[in-house]
A protein has these predicted regions:
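Nuclease-adjacent, charged terminal/linker segments that flank catalytic cores
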Residues: 1-81
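Conserved catalytic cores of phosphodiester-cleaving nucleases, focusing on short active-site segments
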Residues: 149-151, 168-177, 187
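Surface-exposed cleft-lining segments at the edges of enzyme active sites
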Residues: 84-87, 173-179
Length: 196
């Protein structure tokens, strides 16, 4: 399940391969072929941690992203073929790329940290049912925010008899292919909560 979350773009493609028909099935097969070529290039550079390898991975990402961002793969109002932003075909490329780019860092590869999408800890508060229950059940509540990709550490917080698992991000990344003012403000607020 964890590995599946890291290969979120591949999973998106495979889901579409199972359900699409007609022209979209033809399109998603084209994309799958190009995806496999892209991953093969990344895998050839897997052991390389130098700047040139990172640049090459980014160049390969741009080439693949340009391919799937062709107008024929994007659904417009009067067209039945292609995919909208809601299908996440285009946005999941960046999420998966973060995993491929960072998984080779030795200090992240020892099982001490998690890589991938998470519900990140943003804050906690206490909301007991009443004053009397506060002694036994302080009503520990943890707020979390979905993050597209993070390097995180799971920790357990125990207060009284309550115990909660929380994910503390060391690095948290929100991948956006389009960002309006409302989304920007939301991202800034989330970043502020996670950092504090």
């Amino acid at each position: 399940k964890v590995f599946f979350k890291m290969l979120i773009h591949k999973s998106n493609i495979e889901g579409k391969l199972r359900k699409e028909k007609g022209k979209n099935l033809e399109y998603i097969n084209e994309i799958k072929k190009k995806y496999d070529e892209w991953i093969e290039k990344i895998n050839l550079l897997e052991k390389n941690l130098d700047e040139d390898a990172v640049k090459k991975k980014v160049e390969d990402l741009i080439e693949y992203k340009d391919f799937i961002d062709q107008p024929k793969f994007i659904k417009y109002q009067l067209d039945n073929n292609g995919w909208t932003a809601q299908s996440k075909l285009h946005s999941t490329v960046l999420e998966e790329f973060m995993y491929h780019l960072l998984k080779v860092i030795p200090s992240l590869n020892n099982g001490q940290f998690n890589l991938g999408p998470i519900k990140a800890y943003s804050n906690l508060f206490f909301a007991p049912k009443n004053l009397n229950s506060f002694i036994k059940d302080p009503g520990l509540t943890v707020n979390e925010k979905d993050q597209d990709f993070a390097i995180s550490k799971e920790i357990i917080v125990k207060i009284g008899s309550e115990e909660k698992k929380i994910n503390i991000p060391v690095i948290s990344i929100e991948n956006k292919t389009y960002l309006d003012k409302t989304m920007l403000d939301g991202s800034i607020a989330t970043a502020s909560k996670i950092k504090s």
